[in-house]
Amino acid sequence: MVKLADPATKFTKDSLVSETSPLKESWVPLVSDDERQSYASVLPFDTHKASWTTYTQLDGWFDALHPSQFEKSTHSTVDKTAWTPASYRGQPLWRQTAWVTLDPNCECDYGYSDTWQKRATCPTFRRIVQDITEYVQDATGPTFNACNLNYYPTGAGIGWHADDETLWDPFHRPVTIVSLSLCRGPDDGLLAGARRFMIRCQEYHPGDHPYDVVLKHGDLMTMEGFFQKHYLHSVWPGDGMSPDPLNDPFVSGERINLTWRTIVRHLDGSPASRGQVCPLSKLQTDESQTKTTEKPTDPVDNGDEDKR
């Protein structure tokens, strides 16, 4: 028997992005788990060309966000703090990560697994993310106040994890996460830089099966409801490097992934907040403060797999 959230936190399927966005006819359902109230859908860009942006603009976003654009400047007054190397349990990973809060009053850093991701402060980087956010919000419907970014070089992916941090209170309320894939490969083929996105249940129940979808340049994807509570996701080949990156079509290029979320529980000075206090935490209601229990600090042990 799957334990669901309190009835007060239930929501209806007609509130899903795939049902409410201006492009709802083009969304392809991937996970539709009514028992767990967990849903995921994909909006393939190649089936709705120029509907919400263009390939030229997608290419421009990839170039503008690429880590090579934010290497340390020779001018000490130029702030290029954007991407940071990813690590797990003291071991370096292939990915680079970035974290942007979209509300100018929000000072929340992003803590997950054993990582504490500082906010990107580079004005140029933040402006680019904000510009992309406006396009994605127009295409999908929801309004977001934070964006997490991952850069995957050739051969790299990310291990099994759930985006289940306290910032969005995913154990007590439905959460909507929208992601955009920006890809670049050694050629201009359809799979250039594409990645396999894999999904599995956190706890197996009869009838469960894994999901696998190829995310290409410009594809949008949603994870909604209590997806982060009940499901894990990863990007092939996990946290290790592909043994044959040049001949594996799903890791032969680079990928930048942006995932938008909504912070509902800002850092409040608690141990889980590492003592940090966001000014917006003062606006949180007493009910939300007492309702959420602290997550364990130790990550789920998935072998050498990383969180995020």
Feature map (PLM): residue ranges:
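Non-heme Fe(II) oxygenase metal-center motifs and adjacent flexible, charged/small-residue loops
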Residues: 1-308
